[in-house]
Curated annotation (Swiss-Prot):
Places the protein is found: Endoplasmic reticulum; Membrane
GO cellular component: oligosaccharyltransferase complex
Phylogenetic classification of the source organism: Eukaryota, Metazoa, Chordata, Craniata, Vertebrata
Subunit comment: Component of STT3A-containing oligosaccharyl transferase (OST-A) complex. STT3A-containing complex assembly occurs through the formation of 3 subcomplexes. Subcomplex 1 contains RPN1 and TMEM258, subcomplex 2 contains the STT3A-specific subunits STT3A, DC2/OSTC, and KCP2 as well as the core subunit OST4, and subcomplex 3 contains RPN2, DAD1, and OST48. The OST-A complex can form stable complexes with the Sec61 complex or with both the Sec61 and TRAP complexes. Interacts with PSEN1 and NCSTN; indicative for an association with the gamma-secretase complex.
Function: Subunit of STT3A-containing oligosaccharyl transferase (OST-A) complex that catalyzes the initial transfer of a defined glycan (Glc(3)Man(9)GlcNAc(2) in eukaryotes) from the lipid carrier dolichol-pyrophosphate to an asparagine residue within an Asn-X-Ser/Thr consensus motif in nascent polypeptide chains, the first step in protein N-glycosylation. N-glycosylation occurs cotranslationally and the complex associates with the Sec61 complex at the channel-forming translocon complex that mediates protein translocation across the endoplasmic reticulum (ER).
Name the UniProt record assigns to this protein: Oligosaccharyltransferase complex subunit OSTC
Species whose genome carries this gene: Bos taurus (Bovine)
Cytoplasmic side: 1-32, 105-117
Segments traversing the membrane: 33-53, 84-104, 118-138
Length: 149
């Protein structure tokens, strides 16, 4: 197999280039990269690709027993479809849970005072638990009867 990889390089020869990095290109800080990762995670879990391709409405509507239109944020009984607000709300919860885990990890640093450590642990646990239980509530709104024991 290695001989097959060698065949193109018998004909091709790498040029002798001396490339330098442009002076205006700087290494981004860790927080800049982290912010880009969190924003991209928010957009991807929110279904931005689905929203661009399918172009769903931001919220839906359902007719009640009196004939009035009532807005709904969740497209019930459809796992493979969503409204834009539904995707953004779910994405916010997923991102909040992920940030909760990161806050819990940051509370482990050795130089944090005891009160700050307690506050970080509390905020981290609240973020993780709130996002978990709200995701379960969203699933019950999306699929009534699901996860009902």
């Amino acid at each position: 197999m290695e001989s097959l990889y060698r065949v193109p390089f018998l004909v091709l020869e790498c040029p002798n280039l001396k490339l330098k990095k442009p002076p205006w290109v700087h290494m981004p800080s860790a927080m800049t990269v982290y912010a880009l990762v969190v924003v991209s995670y928010f957009l991807i879990t929110g279904g931005i690709i689905y929203d661009v391709i399918v172009e769903p409405p931001s919220v839906g509507s359902v007719t009640d027993e009196h004939g009035h239109q009532r807005p709904v944020a969740f497209l019930a009984y459809r796992v493979n479809g969503q409204y834009i607000m539904e995707g953004l709300a779910s994405s916010f919860l997923f991102t909040m849970g992920g940030l909760g885990f990161i806050i819990l990890d940051r509370s482990n640093a050795p130089n944090i005072p005891k009160l700050n450590r307690f506050l970080l642990l509390f905020i981290g646990f609240v973020c993780v638990l709130l996002s978990f239980f709200m995701a379960r509530v969203f699933m019950r709104m999306k699929l009534p009867g699901y996860l009902m024991g």
